[in-house]
Amino acid sequence: MHQYHDLLERILSDGAQKHDRTGTGTLSVFGHQMRFNLAAGFPMVTTKRLPLKAIVHELLWFLKGDTNIKYLHDHGVTIWDEWADANGDLGPVYGYQWRSWPTSDGGQIDQISNVVDMIRRNPDSRRLIVTAWNPADVEKMALPPCHCLFQFYVANGKLSCQLYQRSADVFLGVPFNIASYALLTMMVAQVTGLKLGEFVHSFGDVHLYSNHIEQARLQLSRTPRPLPTMTLNPDVKDIFAFRYEDFALAGYDPHPHIKAEVAV
């Protein structure tokens, strides 16, 4: 995962000091890209431990089209608690836009179903896109989408995915996002009968919060270990049929967790 360490080092050396919505302050760079060959191992950061359960359940929650944290709580995941209202609702965030994008005539668009179907029918299409950034709904969301648009690409029987992330918390969020979208790409590849290509992660404002600087330096002092492997249950052929038990991570031997406070 040298790509991630290179990004941390770039921000520490070249980042501009900026104010931000949370009042914490950041070091920030604008425009960066990382590439991961998904056939070479599952891109899960090894220089600190990541919570696989939270990564998988959040992705399954998105794919359900859910926007209430009850499902997450039922599975012991609390990563969205700071933004939910008293009823556990978050407004029309990721899952709603992915599965139920509202149309002007009162209908809804299931972008996930559409993109999977299009990959099967027309893999050379340049319209294999899902977006969570809906300007009409942004003000209704507890937190506007940070990872806001992704595009699939098929070549030589391999599926790749590129994510555009407008805003990225490099210490807490980015390792999580890498693993989540790598996993989504694996799932889509399986249900469309394709091999694995690349996950390409493109950023707008990628930043290190001022209260994460020492943690980032600690992480950079650690030597990355071999990437783990992720195996999916080969019997699952429907993107919406995956369950937590269908994912098996092997060979994950990370350095210890590094505690850091989330900026709300």
UniProtKB/Swiss-Prot annotation:
Single Gene Ontology BP annotation: methylation
Enzyme Commission number, as recorded: 2.1.1.45
UniProt keyword list: Cytoplasm, Methyltransferase, Nucleotide biosynthesis, Transferase
Gene3D superfamilies noted in UniProt: Thymidylate synthase/dCMP hydroxymethylase domain
SUPFAM superfamilies assigned: Thymidylate synthase/dCMP hydroxymethylase
Location within or outside the cell: Cytoplasm
Catalysed reactions listed for this entry: dUMP + (6R)-5,10-methylene-5,6,7,8-tetrahydrofolate = 7,8-dihydrofolate + dTMP
Pathway(s) it belongs to: Pyrimidine metabolism; dTTP biosynthesis
Sequence positions that bind (6R)-5,10-methylene-5,6,7,8-tetrahydrofolate: D169, A263
PROSITE patterns per UniProt: THYMIDYLATE_SYNTHASE
Active site: C146
CDD domains per the UniProt record, alphabetical: TS_Pyrimidine_HMase
Residues engaged in binding dUMP: R21, R126, R127, R166, S167, A168, D169, N177, H207, L208, Y209
GO molecular function, one term: thymidylate synthase activity
Role summary: Catalyzes the reductive methylation of 2'-deoxyuridine-5'-monophosphate (dUMP) to 2'-deoxythymidine-5'-monophosphate (dTMP) while utilizing 5,10-methylenetetrahydrofolate (mTHF) as the methyl donor and reductant in the reaction, yielding dihydrofolate (DHF) as a by-product. This enzymatic reaction provides an intracellular de novo source of dTMP, an essential precursor for DNA biosynthesis.
Subunit annotation: Homodimer.
Family membership noted in the UniProt record: Belongs to the thymidylate synthase family. Bacterial-type ThyA subfamily.
Name of protein: Thymidylate synthase
Gene this protein is translated from: thyA
